[in-house]
């Protein structure tokens, strides 16, 4: 926020210097035009969602971290239900989640931080990674059948135990659904969930989060598929009708291949001839001008509108886009600058476009001196 405010000061300072010059020159037309720019100036300061991962510790650590973020200017805090000490990227395998009681305690801790600092309308985004998480670090505490802990434990994969002779030394046993269950435990001590329970766990995560202080949901998925997202959101809205979803249009997805395969599959189901396409090779540039690729691009273009309409997505975001644009542009510039184009690679590919598009950093001293 400090840099954003400095950017405002830089832009407004330049406008006021232009205003002084226009007045000194008795140029009334230019003066009115500059005053209009000042009156309609759009600040660089925008709302920021602070991502605090899994809270970096227990609920007390989460509370302290959230306070720091809010004091720094964050209007929204995003927190996820992975374990703090073995957290993975949302699109990697091996994710481990925590029982609902642990996660809900952190949601309440964030709310307390907002309240203590006098922010009545602070936003909490509760993210669930359960769709791609096949493991849990601990068995949930349960006091009676059907409570939240019991529901969490019902997703554990394991073997029914008939007698004590079925147990080995150190085995853990859970009573669930009227039976004794020995959860499948890895050498690391982690417990495995039943296969194909991810969507059910996501739905339960989201409902309980909204019922315990969260404002928005974030469902981490393995692919950008409107039907999959809508299937989960519709189930959530059966319990919480006004549930709203934040969705990450992640660069981790191979959008081109994924949507081309979605079109391939839908066409195949419709009985259309897809014999000229190799499904696993659809990323190839050889397909770029085909009807399938054109339809896939159309679906990508309308993804945000389609997902908002059909899947209840309230806010679309894209994580780390500038990381990728910086890497790509730097790679291209290096190839051109040290290749045949030489300095023209920079001038034609960067500076000429900056000047014509009115990019403020054409004169780097304006911003480098702010740091």
Label each region the model flagged.
Residues 103-111, 243-253, 340-356:
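Short, basic, helix/turn surface patches
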Residues 304-330:
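Substrate-binding cleft of secreted/luminal carbohydrate-active enzymes
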Residues 1-45, 54-247, 258-287, 293, ...:
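Alpha/beta enzyme core
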Residues 89, 327-341:
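C-terminal helical cap(s) of enzyme catalytic domains, especially alpha/beta-barrels
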Residues 220-223, 247-251, 296, 317-321:
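Active-site proximal loops enriched in glycine and acidic residues that flank catalytic Cys/His/Asp
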Residues 368-371:
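Conserved small/polar residues in nucleotide/adenosyl-binding loops
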Residues 83-86, 251-255, 323-326:
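Short gly/pro/ser/thr-enriched loop/turn and capping motifs at secondary-structure boundaries
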């Amino acid at each position: 926020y400090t840099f954003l405010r400095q950017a405002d000061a830089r832009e407004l300072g330049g406008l006021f210097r232009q205003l002084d010059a226009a007045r000194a020159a008795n140029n009334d037309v230019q003066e009115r035009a500059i005053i209009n720019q000042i009156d309609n100036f759009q600040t660089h300061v925008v709302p920021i969602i602070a991502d605090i991962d899994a809270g970096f510790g227990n609920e007390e650590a989460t509370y302290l971290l959230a306070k720091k973020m809010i004091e720094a200017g964050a209007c929204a805090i995003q927190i996820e239900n992975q374990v703090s000490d073995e957290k993975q990227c949302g699109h990697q395998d091996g994710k481990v989640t925590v029982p609902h009681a642990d996660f809900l305690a952190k949601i309440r801790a964030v709310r307390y931080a907002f309240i203590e600092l006098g922010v009545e309308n602070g936003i909490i985004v509760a993210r669930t990674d359960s769709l791609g998480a096949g493991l849990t670090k601990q068995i949930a505490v349960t006091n009676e059948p059907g409570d939240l802990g019991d529901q969490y434990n019902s997703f554990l994969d394991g073997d029914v135990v008939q007698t004590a002779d079925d147990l080995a030394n150190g085995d853990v046993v859970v009573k669930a659904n009227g039976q004794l269950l020995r959860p499948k435990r890895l050498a690391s001590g982690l417990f495995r969930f039943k296969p194909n329970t991810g969507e059910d766990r996501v739905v339960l995560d989201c409902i309980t989060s909204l019922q315990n202080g969260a404002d928005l949901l974030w469902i981490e998925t393995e692919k950008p598929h409107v039907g999959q997202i809508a299937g989960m959101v519709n189930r959530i809205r059966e319990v919480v009708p006004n549930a709203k979803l934040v969705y990450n249009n992640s660069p981790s997805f191979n959008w081109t291949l994924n949507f081309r395969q979605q079109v391939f599959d839908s066409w195949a189901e419709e009985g259309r001839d897809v014999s000229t396409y190799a499904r696993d090779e659809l990323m190839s540039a050889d397909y770029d001008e085909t009807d399938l690729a054109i339809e896939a691009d159309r679906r990508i273009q309308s993804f945000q509108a389609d997902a908002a309409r059909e899947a209840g997505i309230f806010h679309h975001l894209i994580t780390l886009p500038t990381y990728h644009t910086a890497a790509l542009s730097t790679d291209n510039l290096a190839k051109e600058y040290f290749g045949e184009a030489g300095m023209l690679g920079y001038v034609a590919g960067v500076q000429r476009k900056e000047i014509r598009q009115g990019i403020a950093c054409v004169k780097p001293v304006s911003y480098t001196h702010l740091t």
